[in-house]
Amino acid sequence: LKWLTWYGRGPQENYRDRRNSAFMGVFSSDVYDMKEDYVRAQSMGERTDAKWIVFKDDNGKGIKITAPEGIDFSALHYTDKDLWTVKYGHDTDDVLRREIVLNLDCIQRGIGNASCGPQPRPEYEIASEAEYTFSFRIEPL
């Protein structure tokens, strides 16, 4: 699988505390291009409020993930652990995987405004005492 199309917020990376900068729509990308070129390698590529996500190969075969209530996701050729092993963003090709690492998130904490603070505003934190549920369906194309 190489190609990705989703109905959700995009086209750029967006998180709970930055999703207002991204519009709802249908967006497409090569999975490789979902990475961000940060100076320091780090977790990246989140997209929010996706109602559906489609992955296809060059022949049109693939899968569709449907989440009517919305789901957040990232699809990269790296695990977070891979990214933590490289110092600089331009070194990410050194840990590039052939497979797609797909994260489906019920909720994710906001990322704040700077690498060294301040922390996200309270409404973008995750309440530890709250219960969170989500559902999704995966089907072949």
Residue ranges and their predicted role:
Residues 1-141:
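Beta-strand/loop-rich accessory regions of lumenal/periplasmic or secreted enzymes
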